[in-house]
């Protein structure tokens, strides 16, 4: 199975797998059952921003979700990613819809990772930034239903030609280049990721959510990982 660390924006509570009874953001370490969650005042039809950061000195993974003009939601969890993830990984975004649906539109996405070792010259870093997504992106690996639309947005799940979200959809987008996320001799391994998103839904209860995730380089969508499993996990264990 894939090794997954994720930050989830979970729009639909699945209390049977340990979700709180409201939309929330959460940190997932190798399981859909979040290690830490915070209530998320999701605003459909408004562009939101997510900022995720990790620092190997503090060993804390944190995420902040905000909408312009309203207060932000923060979640964090103390974890040493050296003990969880392989040394080389890929970073990605995933989303699903189920019986209920929503658009899972990504408008921009940036990521920076840094590895500092004792030798001053040896700093390993990777940076990418998408402000628009091209129609046939060479630098993204698109999986499942994910596609880039003519407006320059990344649609993680299916939408109709008129832009309406479709149910029972799962899609992911990964940056093509592997990331050297940690190294034994590194003094500091850190990363920052930011993305902007738009969730719209005709349903009273949108579903299911968007994630930023880090996984082994050969990761693929697990069979049966739709809906509440957010395209990341084969089961709810």
Swiss-Prot record:
Posttranslational modification: The beta and gamma chains are produced by partial proteolytic processing of the lectin alpha chain by an asparaginyl endopeptidase. Mixture of 60% alpha lectin and 40% of its beta and gamma proteolytic fragments.
Superkingdom in the source lineage: Eukaryota
Assigned keywords, A-Z: Calcium, Lectin, Manganese, Mannose-binding, Metal-binding, Vacuole
Pfam families xrefs: Lectin_legB
Gene Ontology cellular-component annotations: aleurone grain; vacuole
Annotated a carbohydrate binding sites: 12, 99-100, 228
Positions annotated to bind Mn(2+): 8, 10, 19, 24, 34
CDD domains documented for this protein: lectin_legume_LecRK_Arcelin_ConA (cd06899)
InterPro entries xref list: ConA-like_dom_sf, Lectin_LegA_CS, Lectin_legB_Mn/Ca_BS, Legume_lectin_dom, Leguminous_Lectin
Compartment(s) of residence: Vacuole, Aleurone grain
Manganese in keyword set: yes
More info: Binds one manganese (or another transition metal) ion and one calcium ion. The metal ions are essential for the saccharide-binding and cell-agglutinating activities.
PANTHER family per UniProt: CONCANAVALIN A-LIKE LECTIN FAMILY PROTEIN, LEGUME LECTIN DOMAIN-CONTAINING PROTEIN
Family: Belongs to the leguminous lectin family.
Name of the molecule in the record: Lectin alpha chain
Organism: Macropsychanthus sclerocarpus
